[in-house]
């Protein structure tokens, strides 16, 4: 353990260094403070923790396996690659870890109505799932662009009893869906619980979502010690808002021997401006209730993000990631659409696992790094979700490629 802990944040104001905070409408402030207090009580309440553990085990299907990717390891010819199989969770991604935690909190607070934003649709599906399980009304905000590319997930949400509200504003993606959800929350503050899907938003959301996702890193630690007798040498995860990454990273932040790498979406390339890499191509600003790195123009207006992956298509990043970038504890790189698609195909062909396009960004980074590392280097990559939802996108890109070469 290091003498200075990287795991004590945020402070009482919800700040991680100069990032985070509570930039919300006055009407929301009492609710935000109430939520923060309720969460502080819940996280030390044995009954709450016992119920959370029960649902993680028997409903979500945890622990998720830590799998030695033998053929990917052979393919790279260097580091030993392990996959943390979050795509095997109920609903097919890491999102359910957070949704179970927050729905138990919503029920504890007596809320009858759940709202959420979604990009790739996985958080929407997970929210609709837990709302159905606990008999609560559910409204999901989703941008029209994302609805077009994630029709299967839209149908799943409706099947689970949720109302899906299309958002036409802006580019019709995650940022716009989050704006609408925040407007709804201000209007229906008494009855409604806003179930945010990532480590962004006003305090206490970044810390709360991280805590519910930290089960990923805690399990990884135990599982790798059991398999290899030691901690990993490096961790790799993709980043949109950054909840799957923070869930893997947080339990290891105070281990100086563990290198940590977050992977943003470079889209068509950082230099083109068509990307979603807030740390590699953005500047600090305020969005959705917190101060963090954002994609902005010279006038401070939010620039639309681009990624082939709907779940990474966000012009900001969780404030704790912004702080970890600032202090240099975590290295943040970026991967293009093309590189992610190549990694997607490689994983399918070599391991018989169809990863989400989000997770494929992390895999692409692994394929760059692993060949340069010694064979005894233990590398864990978070396979945050499965790729069923991305078939339409991948088919479209393969078709384009075939037509180009015809």
From Swiss-Prot:
<keyword id="KW-0057">Aromatic amino acid biosynthesis</keyword>
<dbReference type="GO" id="GO:0004834">
    <property type="term" value="F:tryptophan synthase activity"/>
</dbReference>
<dbReference type="Pfam" id="PF00291">
    <property type="entry name" value="PALP"/>
</dbReference>
<comment type="similarity">
    <text>Belongs to the TrpB family.</text>
</comment>
<dbReference type="InterPro" id="IPR006653">
    <property type="entry name" value="Trp_synth_b_CS"/>
</dbReference>
<keyword id="KW-0663">Pyridoxal phosphate</keyword>
<comment type="subunit">
    <text>Tetramer of two alpha and two beta chains.</text>
</comment>
<dbReference type="InterPro" id="IPR001926">
    <property type="entry name" value="TrpB-like_PALP"/>
</dbReference>
<keyword id="KW-0456">Lyase</keyword>
<comment type="function">
    <text>The beta subunit is responsible for the synthesis of L-tryptophan from indole and L-serine.</text>
</comment>
<dbReference type="InterPro" id="IPR036052">
    <property type="entry name" value="TrpB-like_PALP_sf"/>
</dbReference>
<keyword id="KW-0822">Tryptophan biosynthesis</keyword>
<keyword id="KW-0028">Amino-acid biosynthesis</keyword>
<dbReference type="GO" id="GO:0005737">
    <property type="term" value="C:cytoplasm"/>
</dbReference>
<feature type="modified residue" description="N6-(pyridoxal phosphate)lysine">
    <location>
        <position position="95"/>
    </location>
</feature>
<protein>
    <recommendedName>
        <fullName>Tryptophan synthase beta chain</fullName>
        <ecNumber>4.2.1.20</ecNumber>
    </recommendedName>
</protein>
<comment type="pathway">
    <text>Amino-acid biosynthesis; L-tryptophan biosynthesis; L-tryptophan from chorismate: step 5/5.</text>
</comment>
<dbReference type="InterPro" id="IPR006654">
    <property type="entry name" value="Trp_synth_beta"/>
</dbReference>
<dbReference type="InterPro" id="IPR023026">
    <property type="entry name" value="Trp_synth_beta/beta-like"/>
</dbReference>
């Amino acid at each position: 353990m290091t003498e200075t802990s990287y795991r004590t944040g945020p402070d009482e104001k919800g700040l991680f260094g100069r990032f985070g905070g509570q930039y919300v409408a006055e009407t929301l402030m009492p609710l935000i403070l109430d939520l923060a207090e309720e969460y502080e009580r819940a996280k030390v309440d044995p009954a709450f923790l016992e119920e959370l553990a029960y649902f993680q085990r028997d409903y979500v299907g945890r622990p998720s396996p830590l799998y030695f990717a033998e053929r990917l390891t052979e393919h790279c010819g260097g580091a030993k690659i392990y996959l943390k199989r979050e795509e095997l969770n109920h609903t097919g991604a890491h999102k359910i870890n957070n949704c179970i935690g927050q729905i138990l909190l919503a029920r504890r607070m007596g809320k009858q109505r759940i709202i959420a934003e979604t990009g790739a649709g996985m958080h929407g599906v997970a929210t609709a799932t837990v709302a159905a399980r606990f008999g609560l009304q559910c409204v999901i905000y989703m941008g029209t662009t994302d609805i077009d590319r994630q029709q299967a997930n839209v149908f799943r949400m409706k099947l689970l009893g949720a109302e899906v509200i299309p958002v036409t504003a802006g580019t019709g993606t995650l940022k716009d869906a989050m704006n609408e959800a925040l407007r709804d929350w201000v209007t229906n503050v008494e009855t409604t619980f806003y179930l945010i899907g990532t480590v962004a938003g006003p305090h206490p959301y970044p810390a709360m979502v991280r805590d519910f996702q930290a089960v990923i890193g805690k399990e990884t630690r135990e599982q790798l010690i059991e398999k290899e007798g030691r901690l990993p040498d490096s961790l790799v995860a993709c980043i949109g808002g950054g909840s799957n990454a923070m869930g893997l990273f947080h339990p290891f932040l105070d281990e100086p021997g563990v290198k940590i790498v977050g992977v943003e979406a470079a889209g068509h390339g950082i230099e083109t401006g068509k990307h979603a890499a807030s740390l590699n191509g953005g500047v600090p600003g305020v969005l959705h209730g917190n101060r963090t790195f954002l994609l902005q123009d010279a006038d401070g207006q939010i620039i639309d993000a681009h990624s082939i992956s709907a779940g990474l298509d966000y012009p900001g990043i969780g404030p704790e990631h912004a702080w970890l970038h600032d202090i240099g504890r975590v290295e943040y790189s970026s991967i293009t659409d093309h590189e992610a698609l190549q990694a997607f195909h490689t994983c399918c062909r070599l391991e018989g696992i169809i990863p989400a396009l989000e997770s494929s960004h992390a895999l692409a980074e692994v394929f760059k790094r692993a060949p340069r590392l010694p064979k005894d280097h233990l590398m864990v990559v978070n396979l945050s979700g499965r790729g069923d939802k991305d078939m339409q996108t991948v088919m479209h890109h393969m078709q384009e490629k075939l037509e180009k070469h015809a």
